[in-house]
């Protein structure tokens, strides 16, 4: 394996069509699933934890670009480069879908990392890769999939 060329992809929080809206992972899809079933959305803590969300098709394009690039032996962060708190995410969902829903705040969990967002400048530079699907459009696409 000596001399093997590689690239490592470090995705942020991917979401999108075909993600399980009935599970417990993937806050955006889980929130939309609960909204579609008219269930309360549960937030652990005060909703201030922040994450970097990336639509799945943008992630796939980044992976493909990393597989074919001449810039090898790199670690590429793949995300939007923007962090949204859970409260901000809920506001975005409400604004985009024009739907009201109930949120239930639960006691915080010690395992939740306060902030996760990635610097994707190396992927932008070496892979000529950029996010194409803004969060608002990604919410709509995911919602359309769940409603089918």
What do these predicted regions represent?
Residues 1-17:
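Conserved beta-loop-beta element that borders a ligand/cofactor-binding pocket
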Residues 14-30, 39-40, 44, 48, ...:
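Glycine/proline-rich active-site loop of Rossmann-fold NAD(P)-dependent oxidoreductases
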Residues 56, 75, 88, 109-130, ...:
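Conserved C-terminal active-site "lid" loop/helix of NAD(P)H-dependent oxidoreductases
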Residues 135-148:
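Amphipathic terminal alpha-helices
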Residues 34, 38, 66-70, 126, ...:
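Generic structural signal for alpha-helix termini and adjacent loop/cap motifs
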Residues 8, 53, 83, 117, ...:
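Short aromatic/basic micro-patch
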Residues 1-2, 37, 97:
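Helix C-cap/helix->beta junction micro-motif
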Residues 45-49, 127-131:
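Catalytic Tyr-x(3-8)-Lys segment
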């Amino acid at each position: 394996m000596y001399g093997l060329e590689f690239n490592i992809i470090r995705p942020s929080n991917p979401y999108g069509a075909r993600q399980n809206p009935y599970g417990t992972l993937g806050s955006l899809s889980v929130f939309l699933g609960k909204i579609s079933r008219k269930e309360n959305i549960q937030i652990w803590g005060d909703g201030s934890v922040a994450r970097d969300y990336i639509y799945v098709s943008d992630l796939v394009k980044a992976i493909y670009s990393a597989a074919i690039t001449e810039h090898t032996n790199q670690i590429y962060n793949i995300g939007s480069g923007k962090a949204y708190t859970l409260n901000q995410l809920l506001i975005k969902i409400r604004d985009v879908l024009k739907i009201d829903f109930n949120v239930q705040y639960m006691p915080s969990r010690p395992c939740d990392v306060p902030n996760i967002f990635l610097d994707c400048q190396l992927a932008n530079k070496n892979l000529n890769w950029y996010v194409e699907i803004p969060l608002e459009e990604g919410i709509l696409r995911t919602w359309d999939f769940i409603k089918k």
